[in-house]
Each structure stands twice: as structure tokens, then as C-alpha cells.
Amino acid sequence: VTAECGEFSFKSVKKACEIGAKAIVTAPVAKNSLYLAGHKFNGQTEILQKYLAHDNQLAEMLFLANNFKVLLLTRHVALKNINLTKELVVEKILNLRGFFRQHFNIENPKFALCGFNPHAGEDGILGKEEIDILIPAVDKLREKGVNITKPLPADTLFVEAAREYFEEQTSVKYDCYIANYHDQGLIPIKTVAGDKTVNMTIGLDIIRTSPGHGTAFDIAGKNIADETGMIEAIKAVL
């Protein structure tokens, strides 16, 4: 982890943004190396947002493994700093519906929304985010024709997704699960799919994919790395 490596990683992603590619596949990058090089980005998604977004586009993180798909409403942010608003939730999920229509040819995708708090807040006893933010967002989205559930307890919501994944079902209950923060969505999909999980950046004019895992410096030079993640990332844009 050095400033030189961070600078090389940054310039590589920036160059990919500049050449007019229809899709970009990136390898994992060490965020601390970006910081050492003076580039204060929390990840490659944020770099893509800076150099490719226009007309108020939002780059979002969609994770997929075959029929199991998860959208994150927030990206690389500390739990104490999560700041969801009704307007932001509505915008991100409308973008997601547009992406499903354009790229997956699903006109009316079914979305399952995770509750923010344990047991989806228990009617406000365990937290007010569902009442103050998520339920009003769902009401607005339904007015716009979005097929979305109310906030559901996240600890049980993903059980069905895991079963469908292992049974390799092509017909699923929900086309995408919507998580409020990073670990809420990534723990379930990575637990069942492992290295087959792909990170897909949506919301921009191009699609970017990368393996769902990190740099794995702990196994560097040991000849035990598994290329599955990179292969799946490449296949996802073809």
C-alpha cells in the first residue's frame, strides 16, 4: 500500500472514464493507497461518479450473483454517518427501476425493501427511520407505479433469496433487494455466493463491474488467489 500504487490506480480508472468505453471492468483497489496519493475517494464508484456523471446522475452500487441482486442505498460510509432522506430513497429506487427496464428487460420489477432498524423498527419502538423516511418513500414510489414492499425485517428477508440462489431458480419472488447500508446488503449475498458476487455500478451512461471482493493482500504471492470474481465481473458486462 503506497502512494505510487494509489496514483496508478486512480489514473487507470480516470483514463478508462476518458476513452469513451461502453463498459469498464475494474480490479479491486486499496482505498488507503488512494488516500496516500492525495485522492480522497472512498472507492472507485466515487471516482466514476466524479468523472462520468452528468445531469445530476447518481452512481449506485448493485451487487448480483445470478438471480440474487442487492442495491445499496448508501455506499462506503460509517454507520454513524448514514443520512437517508425520503427524496434520496425515491430517486435511487426510480433509477433502479429504469436500469431493470433497460438492461434486464423487466418492465415492472419487484423490489423488497429492508427495514433500517431491527425488526423494521417495531412500529417506532426500535427506531423511527421506517416511519419518518422509508414508509413515506414507499408511498411516493407506489404513486409512481413502483412495485415495492413496505420496509421488512432484514434478518429474515434474505432467507428466500438464499434458497432461490442455491436452487438456481429462474423465477424469483423479488427481482432486487434494497439495503440501507453496506453490510446489511453485502453480508447475505456474499455469504451465499462468495467470489461469484459482482459489484455493478449503475446510474451512469456506461456500466462498470468489478469483483465483489477486495484486494486480498493477505494472500499475495502465495499462489492461492481465485480468479472467479474477475471472470464473473467480465461476464456480467458481455
For the regions a language model picked out, list residue spans one by one:
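Anion-binding alpha/beta catalytic cores of soluble intermediary-metabolism enzymes, centered on
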Residues: 1-238
